[in-house]
């Protein structure tokens, strides 16, 4: 029987997030795609998971982060928007925009075991994610076959996206 004395913040976080657990991971893994079609799952925000009839799996623009977490910086000072930020330039706003996650995290990146490519259309932080990169590098069993040669899962994106991945430790090849 559960006891309140055993509940900690860490247990709550680990037991609650991602909100869907591995439900969607399991659904994707168990889905057989009919010939001549493909399957697609919305991962929240801008993310998509695409699976083909040949069992090719592509994550596109998957973000599993939380956005901004506080109005304040580490010194307790209220954060303001960088005047060069596109929203500040467009609107003249100076108050920090929240960029909070508005939909649940539906896919557990650390439960991904089969993926053929990670794709980021651009480097806005809701299109590219360090958690998925780390999970793919450490957990994926299936390697991509290119021209009959087994290779690591490719991370595909613009120069800015690939530079960001490299800065996180994703290997060049």
Where do the protein language model's features map onto the residues?
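A short catalytic or substrate-binding loop motif that flags glycine-/basic-rich loops and adjacent residues
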Residues: 40-44
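A conserved hydrophobic position in a structured secondary element of the catalytic/binding core
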Residues: 60, 128, 157
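Metallo-beta-lactamase
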Residues: 3-35, 141, 147-173
